[in-house]
Amino acid sequence: MRLATEPASLPSGLPEPRRVAVLSVHTSPLAQPGTGDAGGMNVYVLQTALELANRGVDVEIFTRATSSADQPVVPVAPGVLVRNVVAGPFEGLDKNDLPTQLCAFTAGVLRAEATHEPGYYDIVHSHYWLSGQVGWLAADRWAVPLVHTAHTLAAVKNASLAAGDAPEPPMRSIGEQQVVDAADRLIVNTEHEAQQLVSLHQADPARIDVVHPGVDLATFTPGDRLAARAALGLDANSRIVAFVGRIQPLKAPDVLLRAAALLPDVQVLIAGGPSGSGLISRPGAGGLATPDNLVNLAAELGMTDRVTFLPPQSRDNLVQVYRAADVVAVPSYSESFGLVAVEAQACGTPVVAAAVGGLPVAVRDGVSGALVDGHDPGDWAGTLADVLAADPATLSRAAVDHAATFSWSHTVDALLAGYGRAIADHRARHQGQLARRSGRRFSMRRGVRA
């Protein structure tokens, strides 16, 4: 038996879940962020699960097995299990082909639940639309509420594609609409995302909870910049702008390279691996942000000696990357929040980010960094130069202060409140349905006696 280290702080009268089934079909929370499809969502799923467990809530995370070496059940921490569900081939299955394996995945989830006593889970929380499709069926089968977090929306991504990038297929938009309609509650990162759900998918605002993601404030902390640079083999005296994340057109690392080319004394550090359309160099799409194309672009811009590429980094090494940089750039075309921006600021590093999606929440414009409208390299170069010229101590303090307003504890406070509302509403609907059925049976009996 586990003891909660911190009581769940729910609004008075809301029920508290005992056990949560979390669905993350397309990417495991144990995967290294910055590789394949692993990114901020992986961090979110794992960190919220750990914090829920700290509150005494048991969490089982279901994800698709991607290797024959994956154990069926992986205990992560007391109260947190990851279940690797076999659904389709372990390797070589593109994310766009995963819908063909949702039936197999759903069957695996239902089989796992069948090993528990009836009524084991109190709630299902699905992440991304693929998981939402599974969650829709599982929640209905188990007669529990479905809470869904989209993380990204096809309509939003398609409205702001990088040049040459592939749009999301219509199948995804249809699937997202189905999940929005089926979910008892929808969790979004920002008010802006809530507005998008309402305008694009006609979501009921009363069913939406705004829950800011957090940051591990015990891990991501300020530190010695020179020591961090020495650990990474970087020059002690250079001005360094870092990019951290998956290398794909959506994240726009090529925009950073073109901007840095206009700043001759700036070094660029890129830490991450290919993902999505960043895995493929298509004919006629030479500008796409694939690793090979970025290397070629650096050569074309005459700045090969000013760009350092690192593979995806562990959390401890990632802290060193943030500390080593003078500025972290987040030039994404679309970003529902931007955990990288908050992690960097927690390490005392200011951020220059695109003014899209949730980044205006993650970065305090003019205080902890700066926001840039659009993706013109000249505009980015000018903003980077301004931030690099500002007082670093003032920016660093402001960055740390802003990041301190985001924590996984605060995230889970709000998440538990959303869970409580979902459970309460679901129970009320169920009781109402029972009452209506009982009333109909009574009326029928009276009619027979008459």
UniProtKB/Swiss-Prot annotation:
Sites where the protein binds Mg(2+): 322-323, 325, 349
Q: Report the EC code(s) recorded for this entry.
A: 2.4.1.250
Per UniProt, UDP-N-acetyl-alpha-D-glucosamine binds at: 32-33, 40, 246, 251, 313, 335, 343
InterPro entries named in the record = Glyco_trans_1, Glyco_trans_4-like_N, Mycothiol_biosynthesis_MshA
Judged by the first EC level, this protein's enzyme class is: transferase
The UniProt catalytic activity note for this protein reads: 1D-myo-inositol 3-phosphate + UDP-N-acetyl-alpha-D-glucosamine = 1D-myo-inositol 2-acetamido-2-deoxy-alpha-D-glucopyranoside 3-phosphate + UDP + H(+)
Is Metal-binding included in the keywords of this UniProt record?
Answer: yes
A matching Pfam family: Glyco_trans_4_4
Specify the superkingdom. Bacteria
Gene3D superfamilies for this protein: Glycogen Phosphorylase B
| Flavoprotein is among the record's keywords | no
**Keyword terms:** Glycosyltransferase, Magnesium, Metal-binding, Transferase
Q: Name one GO biological process term.
A: mycothiol biosynthetic process
A single Gene Ontology molecular function, please? D-inositol-3-phosphate glycosyltransferase activity
Q: Where does 1D-myo-inositol 3-phosphate bind?
A: 26, 37-42, 95, 128, 152, 172
For this protein, the record's PANTHER family field holds: D-INOSITOL 3-PHOSPHATE GLYCOSYLTRANSFERASE, GLYCOSYLTRANSFERASE
Q: What does this protein do?
A: Catalyzes the transfer of a N-acetyl-glucosamine moiety to 1D-myo-inositol 3-phosphate to produce 1D-myo-inositol 2-acetamido-2-deoxy-glucopyranoside 3-phosphate in the mycothiol biosynthesis pathway.
**Family listed:** Belongs to the glycosyltransferase group 1 family. MshA subfamily.
Classification via NCBIfam families: mycothiol_MshA
**Subunit field text:** Homodimer.
> What protein does this entry describe?
D-inositol 3-phosphate glycosyltransferase
What species is this protein from? Mycolicibacterium vanbaalenii (strain DSM 7251 / JCM 13017 / BCRC 16820 / KCTC 9966 / NRRL B-24157 / PYR-1)
